[in-house]
UniProtKB/Swiss-Prot annotation:
Part of the 50S ribosomal subunit. Forms a bridge to the 30S subunit in the 70S ribosome. Interacts weakly with protein L37Ae. One of the primary rRNA binding proteins. Required for association of the 30S and 50S subunits to form the 70S ribosome, for tRNA binding and peptide bond formation. It has been suggested to have peptidyltransferase activity; this is somewhat controversial. Makes several contacts with the 16S rRNA in the 70S ribosome. NCBIfam families: PRK09612.1 (NF007180). Transmembrane segments: none annotated. GO terms for biological process: cytoplasmic translation. Belongs to the universal ribosomal protein uL2 family. Residues 200-240 are annotated as: Disordered. Pfam families: Ribosomal_L2 (PF00181), Ribosomal_L2_C (PF03947). This is Large ribosomal subunit protein uL2. InterPro entries: NA-bd_OB-fold, Rib_uL2_dom2, Ribosomal_uL2, Ribosomal_uL2_arc_euk, Ribosomal_uL2_C, Ribosomal_uL2_CS, Ribosomal_uL2_dom3, Ribosomal_uL2_RNA-bd_dom.
């Protein structure tokens, strides 16, 4: 009987595989306002959140509410931000897609009205509002996908701060270790072909190779369910 593979250990749900969400600061949802109203707030601090790659801005609103938002590029301490239908078109302001001019870069875009923001939230990324009418708004996501959304979905104007983060190398394995530990990510990941035969279905042998077909049934038992799971096809392909 071989040892449990990593997928089986992950399913047990020990602390090794759980994200330390008790350290995360906030969900960074859009501030809710009444229809037609605009509420202003002042950026009082720029903070780091272990949950994400981008910096977050602490905003204190006129009514005393203080919350964290995703910080766009160009927003700093002391700046005034607005949330509402008639907010100004300026970086950091949040308003419905129907009120934003076409071609403007946006971030933290809602998937459905009122959900707080789901798309374009990583550092240095933005979505682009291509077109909108009374019934639908078309947004180009960072992946290139064209998303058709409700025009009442809200978004923050601007590009998420922290661009260029990936340009700086980790240099040392210790730096990478601390980053992964903050996220609760299992690291490093050892390849199955580099393991012993007792540790993985692809392990063992005089050289590193799977030693068996990588395609595997969807209904395979957990200890064998590695490789190309229920693949319709594998390889580079060619002309159909």
């Amino acid at each position: 009987m071989g040892r449990r593979i990593q997928g089986q250990r992950r399913g047990r749900g020990t602390s090794t595989f759980r994200a330390p969400s008790h350290r995360y600061k906030a969900d960074l949802e859009h501030r809710k306002v009444e229809d037609g109203d605009v509420i202003a707030g002042t950026v009082v601090d720029i903070e780091h959140d272990p949950a994400r790659s981008a910096p977050v801005a602490a905003v204190e609103f006129e009514d005393g509410d203080r919350r964290l938002i995703l910080a766009p590029e160009g927003v700093g301490v002391g700046d005034e931000l607005q949330v509402g239908v008639s907010a100004e078109i300026a970086p950091g302001n949040t308003l419905p897609l129907a009120e934003i001019p076409e071609g403007v870069p946006v971030c933290n875009v809602e998937s459905s009205p009122g959900d707080g923001g789901k798309f374009a939230r990583a550092s240095g990324v933005n979505a682009q509002l291509l077109t909108h009418d009374r019934n639908v708004a078309v947004v180009k996501l960072p992946s290139g996908e064209m998303k058709r959304l409700d025009p009442q979905c809200r978004a923050t104007i601007g590009v998420v701060a922290g661009g260029g983060r990936t340009d700086k190398p980790f240099v040392k394995a210790g730096n990478k270790h601390h980053k992964m530990k903050a996220r609760g990510t299992k690291w490093p990941n050892v390849r199955g072909v580099a393991m012993n035969a007792v540790d993985h279905p692809f392990g063992g042998g005089g050289r590193q190779h799977p030693g068996k077909p990588k395609s595997i049934s969807r209904n395979a038992p957990p200890g064998r369910k590695v490789g190309d799971i229920a693949s319709k096809r594998t390889g580079r392909g060619g002309n159909e």
